[in-house]
């Protein structure tokens, strides 16, 4: 570790084969036929139910995005009003400070 700039620089690279396998497991022929048969059993009702569920989820997501958009727009309007209000208060405080300075004699009347 003497020649390393950061801790861990001297570590060896981990081979990718430790994380995943590049070969698919071979399935027995008997199970393969059962899987194909199960896939054929999907009738139109289950497909319609899947499509209906998917449509509900998409509708729900679009509704949430619309609500987020409205909320962001409302927050933008409120922020704009607050910024204008802060600027108005700043200008009023400066004029009040000038008025107090004139009345106390610290500054001549302009």
UniProtKB/Swiss-Prot annotation:
Database matches in InterPro entries: Chordopox_Fusion/A27
Annotated localization: Virion
Documented effect of changing residue 54 to A: Forms more tetramers than hexamers
Coiled coil: 36-101
GO cellular component: viral envelope
GO biological process, one term: fusion of virus membrane with host plasma membrane
Superkingdom to which the source organism belongs: Viruses
Pfam families (alphabetical): Vac_Fusion (PF02346)
Principal subcellular localisation of the protein: virion
Keywords recorded for this protein, A-Z: Coiled coil, Disulfide bond, Host-virus interaction, Phosphoprotein, Virion
Subunit structure: Homohexamers, covalently linked. Interacts with OPG144 and OPG153.
Reported function: Structural protein involved in the envelopment of mature virion (MV) to form the wrapped virion (WV). The wrapping consists of the addition of Golgi membranes to the mature virion. Participates in mature virion (MV) movement within the infected cell. May play an indirect role in MV-cell fusion.
Family: Belongs to the orthopoxvirus OPG154 protein family.
Name of the protein described by the UniProt record: Protein OPG154
Native source species: Vaccinia virus (strain Western Reserve)
Source species taxonomy: Viruses, Varidnaviria, Bamfordvirae, Nucleocytoviricota, Pokkesviricetes
Chain's gene name: OPG154
């Amino acid at each position: 570790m003497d020649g390393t700039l950061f801790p861990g620089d001297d570590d060896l690279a981990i081979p990718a084969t430790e994380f995943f396998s590049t070969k698919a497991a071979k399935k027995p022929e008997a199970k393969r036929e059962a899987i194909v048969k199960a896939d054929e059993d999907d009738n139109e009702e289950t497909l319609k139910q899947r499509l209906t569920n998917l449509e509900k989820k998409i509708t729900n997501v679009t509704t949430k995005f619309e609500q987020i958009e409205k909320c962001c727009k409302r927050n933008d309007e409120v922020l704009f009003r607050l910024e204008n209000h802060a600027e108005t208060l700043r200008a009023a405080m400066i004029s009040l400070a000038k008025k107090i300075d004139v009345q106390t004699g610290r500054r001549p009347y302009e």
